[in-house]
A protein has these predicted regions:
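Conserved loop-to-helix N-cap of the C-terminal "lid" that shapes the substrate pocket in Rossmann-like
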Residues: 33, 63-71
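Alpha-helical segment proximal to the catalytic Tyr-Lys
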Residues: 22-26, 83
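A glycine/serine/threonine-rich, flexible loop-to-helix segment
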Residues: 26, 36-59, 69, 99-105
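Short C-terminal tail/terminal secondary-structure segment
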Residues: 75, 86-105
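Conserved SDR Rossmann-fold cofactor-binding beta-strand/turn motif
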Residues: 30-40, 78, 91-93
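Alpha-helical substrate-binding/gating segment
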Residues: 71-82
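Active-site helix of classical SDR
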Residues: 9, 17
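Conserved catalytic loop/helix region of short-chain dehydrogenase/reductase
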Residues: 1-5, 28
Length: 105
């Protein structure tokens, strides 16, 4: 089944993050987003019949994400360490996006 609307909504989040960040940074409001890759969820579970083994095999980190992975990013963005991060969409996917062009075989 095509996922055009899902893909469009993801792209909208990326763009909205940049636009809001540019507008709100003047008021000292920082806007950033997290783009999670494969994490256990109802949506992903339904797509793979709750068998994440194939996703884990294809992921450079050999696993799906955990709540702690997202929590670490949230803590970073909410702390002084993230105080200079503005308008970023941080991908948390175990390296899938960054290594995709190297795995075209």
């Amino acid at each position: 089944m095509p996922t055009f609307s899902y893909s469009a909504s993801k792209a909208a989040v990326h763009h909205l993050t940049r636009v809001l960040a540019a507008q709100l940074v003047k008021e000292n409001i920082l806007v950033n987003a997290i783009a999670p890759g494969p994490y256990p969820s109802n949506m992903l579970g339904a797509a793979v019949n709750h068998d994440y083994s194939e996703i884990e095999k294809r992921n450079p980190r050999k696993r799906v994400g955990t709540p702690e992975d997202i929590a670490g990013l949230v803590i970073f963005l909410c702390s002084r360490a993230g105080a200079y991060t503005v308008g970023e969409t941080i991908t948390s996917d175990g390296g899938i996006v960054k290594t995709a062009s190297h795995n075209l075989s």
